[in-house]
């Protein structure tokens, strides 16, 4: 029997640290980031079908979806007109800084490569990923990675210990391009401490990471959406929360929490405040087959 469908779990990411190191002549920002897979995922089903590419993802359906564009690039490279249906069950919030669209695109590439019996090498898939968006390369790899360039150049780091996380997202999101524009007005370029991150991660203790949490986009996004600053400040007051940071360009804020029980208690407080809340943890790897 010929396999005609592959299912993937596409995992979200957080940025444990993000420094903007410069701006290229083409306008893209260069960065250094410690990127980390977490246990929130979208479920992706990719099916060989008739009638071109179709992408079903609620209000995010159609050609603008990054998974659709991933399928377009994949088929174009093969010179194939095979019909593809992509169904995405969305759990990762959008405009949150959690890389949901990038995770879906990476999962689509991986599923298609399996369906077509691996016509592309890992390096060739990375090349597609770089064309699609800065976070897609990380989502292909997953785990704990040091990202440079515009986010597409990856270097492995020691796996993060299993860290209990609470994620809180305001109703309003932050547009990534707007966050970078706001940074350009007032932000200053900086660098992360690679050796410090290696040492902290190798220690296996969540507490070791707290002094290194950092995000150059945080002040810019907080200016666009001041509620982010309030969420972070309130989260830091909760019993068991060791540290908190906005992920990516926001608007989601994550808290590193000592125990899962404490994380659930913190989540209950924020649910009573009518916030979008998730209790999750770090993952040693990224997307997996269903």
UniProtKB/Swiss-Prot annotation:
Biological processes per GO annotation: isopentenyl diphosphate biosynthetic process, methylerythritol 4-phosphate pathway; terpenoid biosynthetic process
Q: Name one Pfam family in it.
A: GHMP_kinases_C
Q: Tell me a Gene Ontology molecular-function term this record carries.
A: ATP binding
Pathway per its UniProt entry is:
Isoprenoid biosynthesis; isopentenyl diphosphate biosynthesis via DXP pathway; isopentenyl diphosphate from 1-deoxy-D-xylulose 5-phosphate: step 3/6
Keyword terms of this UniProt record:
ATP-binding, Isoprene biosynthesis, Kinase, Nucleotide-binding, Transferase
Q: Which InterPro entries match?
A: GHMP_kinase_C_dom, GHMP_kinase_C_sf, GHMP_kinase_N_dom, IspE, Ribosomal_Su5_D2-typ_SF, Ribsml_uS5_D2-typ_fold_subgr
Q: Which residues form the active site?
A: 13, 135
Catalysed reactions, as listed in the record: 4-CDP-2-C-methyl-D-erythritol + ATP = 4-CDP-2-C-methyl-D-erythritol 2-phosphate + ADP + H(+)
State its Enzyme Commission number(s): 2.7.1.148
Q: What does this protein do?
A: Catalyzes the phosphorylation of the position 2 hydroxy group of 4-diphosphocytidyl-2C-methyl-D-erythritol.
Please state which protein family the record places this protein in. Belongs to the GHMP kinase family. IspE subfamily.
Q: What is the designated name of this protein? A: 4-diphosphocytidyl-2-C-methyl-D-erythritol kinase
Q: Which organism is it from?
A: Desulfitobacterium hafniense (strain Y51)
């Amino acid at each position: 029997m010929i396999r005609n469908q592959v299912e993937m779990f596409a995992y979200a990411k957080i940025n444990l640290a993000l420094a903007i190191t410069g701006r290229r002549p083409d306008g893209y920002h260069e960065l250094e980031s410690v990127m980390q897979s977490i246990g929130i995922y979208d479920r992706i089903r990719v099916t060989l079908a008739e009638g071109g590419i179709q992408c079903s993802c609620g209000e995010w359906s159609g050609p603008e979806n990054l998974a659709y564009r991933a399928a377009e690039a994949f088929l174009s490279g093969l010179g194939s007109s095979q019909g593809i249906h992509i169904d995405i069950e969305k759990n990762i919030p959008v405009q949150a800084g959690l890389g949901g669209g990038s995770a879906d695109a990476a999962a689509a590439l991986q599923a298609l490569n399996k369906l077509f019996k691996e016509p592309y090498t890992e390096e060739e898939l990375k090349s597609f990923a770089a064309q699609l968006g800065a976070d897609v390369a990380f989502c292909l790899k997953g785990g704990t990675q040091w990202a440079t360039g515009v986010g597409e150049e990856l270097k492995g780091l020691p796996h993060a210990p299993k860290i209990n996380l609470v994620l809180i997202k305001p109703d309003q999101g932050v547009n990534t391009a707007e966050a970078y524009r706001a940074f350009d007005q007032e932000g200053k370029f900086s660098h992360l401490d690679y050796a410090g991150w290696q040492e902290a991660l190798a220690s296996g203790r969540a507490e070791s990471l707290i002094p290194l949490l950092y995000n150059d986009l945080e002040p810019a996004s907080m200016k666009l959406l001041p509620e982010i600053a309030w969420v972070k400040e309130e989260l830091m007051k909760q019993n068991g929360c060791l540290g908190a940071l906005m992920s990516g360009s926001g608007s989601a804020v994550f808290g590193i929490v000592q125990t899962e029980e404490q994380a659930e208690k913190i989540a209950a407080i924020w649910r009573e405040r009518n916030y979008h809340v998730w209790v999750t943890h770090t993952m040693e790897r990224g997307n997996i087959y269903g």
